[in-house]
Amino acid sequence: DSTTFLNSFYPSANDYHSLHEIDNFSWFNGGRNLFEETPLKINESKVFTLKNKTKASTGILTVAVTTGDYKSTIKVEANGRELGEIHIAPGDSFDKGYEIIRDYAVSNLQSVDSIRLTTISGGPTRLDYLAMTYPTPAPAPSLNTSFPTPEYVYNITNQDHHADDPVNMVIIIPTSQKLLQQAERLADFHRTHDNITVRIVPADELYNEFSSGTPDAMAYRRYMKMLYDRTTNAQTMPQSLLLFGDCVWDNRMNTNSCRLLNPDDYLLAYESENSFS
């Protein structure tokens, strides 16, 4: 029934938090940890708001701020009350960006809390995220209201890569398949000159079957692991994986340098969390 269904997921971790995070800037062209593009120059401030759905009067405010390769100080205020200052002192001359995360105990919370950040030295600085953690959860969602409807993106053709037999070489091409003809040329070369089996797979077909439709590099790995586990002899053992096409560090295409690119023309790259500097 509806009560059992609700109890299966409520309350969850998200019900105890309010978050402000915009990912559209990077200090360095690398990493998967992005920041908010709006710069706060010296003596400039910006007010951010966090909705308090829990109606709690106390909470823990987490502030994550970043700066370039220079010292900066950011003043933090909540609902007009100063909480403290965050000092960022770069240490490695090779790094392009630095981040400091601080927690503050906050009282007298409102239905909408205002967080003001002011750069009082150095700068410009940029926000990574603001998060408020509450001691009580937000009210349970009403199951009588309307729910979002799925968005139609495109028709998926019939496919069943879970039925694929092992091959010696897998070539993954971008979703747009603009490189299909060249990939076929390379595959034919290996079949003829190396006497190996080769399969060409568009990236989106792997996402649809191995990562629930979400562009995720783990789909590449899961597909190859399936072929490896399915192998029964050395002749059919997967030997090579070729990512045939360009990768780009900003897989979500959120930053200015990547925003105008077509994701379907690129394969996914792995970027670590701390590679932003």
Name each model-derived stretch.
Residues 194-207:
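Short, well-structured beta-strand/strand-turn elements
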Residues 1-177, 181-182, 188-193, 209-277:
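Structured catalytic cores of large enzymes
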